[in-house]
Every structure is written in structure tokens, then in C-alpha cells.
């Protein structure tokens, strides 16, 4: 049985870095993937699904939700280790519902927890912009990414809270402190 942990958080929350470090600290037991990496790996594999994905990405189009979710679930099932961390998913209620639907049919994958790395908008902005004050376009891009993240956040939180699997972590600390807490939490759930 594969245990899946989804790690969500604002741009600049450190979710990818946290997950990478935890996987590196536990090479025998934990895999980490990002959705983009999984799609690129599927294309590189030359599989039928990879060819379909490339048909969309090569034209700059979004990959249909169903294909994204199938790719994620396939990667989880084929992961060499039993614990899988995926960061940056779900990004929408549609992605959340699609994954939930597929996981209901899967007996060998369990969504163990969704970990939300919480940071204020100001901290996230400072991290993303590297404290380089001024460049409005960068701040503008950040604000857009932030609003895209925040728009579906409440229903996503409510959905996973109702399932009793949402776990929030304060992301406004050192990487060491955050990783230590997150890693300890993940291990406590195995």
C-alpha cells in the first residue's frame, strides 16, 4: 500500500524545498515528485500517454485534467518506495475532486495526509521577489500567482478537513525547523 502525502502552500512557502530535503533524508523510504516533473518524465518515456501529453504541451496548451491525474496515480503506483510526497497539487477544486475520484477506485494507494505550509502573503512575496523591492512586473506576477493559489484554497481546506487529513505547518520559520516538523509528522503517520 502506497502512502501519499500532498504538500500544498503559496508560491514562496518552501513546499518544494521541504519535500526535496525530506526525500533526500529518507532515500530508502520516500519519493518526491512535482506534477510538472511527472508530466515531463511521461513524455520522455515515449509512452502512449506521454505522446498525448506532448501533443498538448508542445503547443503550449494545458494538459487535460484526467490525463494529469492518471499520470500522477500511475507514478505513485510505480514509485520504488512506499511513501510518496507530491508538492503543488491540487491547485484547484477540479484537480482535488478528480484525484479523489480515482483514489476511491485504487486499493493500493492511500491519501494519508494533505500538508499545508502556511505563510503570510508578505513573507511569500518577500521570498519570491528575493526582497528586491521595485520591479512592479515581478510583484504583479507574484500577486497573480498568489490569487490563483488563494482562489480555491478555502474549499480545498474544507474538503480535506472534513476527511480529517489536513495538517497545517507554520512555514514562517527556518527550513530546518519546518523540515524537522514535517518529517516528524510524516513518519508519525506511517
UniProtKB/Swiss-Prot annotation:
In alphabetical order, the GO MF annotations are: adenylate kinase activity; ATP binding
What UniProt keywords apply to this chain's record, in alphabetical order? ATP-binding, Cytoplasm, Kinase, Nucleotide biosynthesis, Nucleotide-binding, Transferase
Q: Region (LID): which ranges?
A: 130-136
GO biological process terms held by the UniProt record: AMP salvage
- Specify one Pfam family: ADK
This enzyme catalyses: AMP + ATP = 2 ADP
**Listed pathway(s):** Purine metabolism; AMP biosynthesis via salvage pathway; AMP from ADP: step 1/1
Role of this protein? Catalyzes the reversible transfer of the terminal phosphate group between ATP and AMP. Plays an important role in cellular energy homeostasis and in adenine nucleotide metabolism.
Q: What is this protein called?
A: Adenylate kinase
What's the source species for this entry? Wolinella succinogenes (strain ATCC 29543 / DSM 1740 / CCUG 13145 / JCM 31913 / LMG 7466 / NCTC 11488 / FDC 602W)
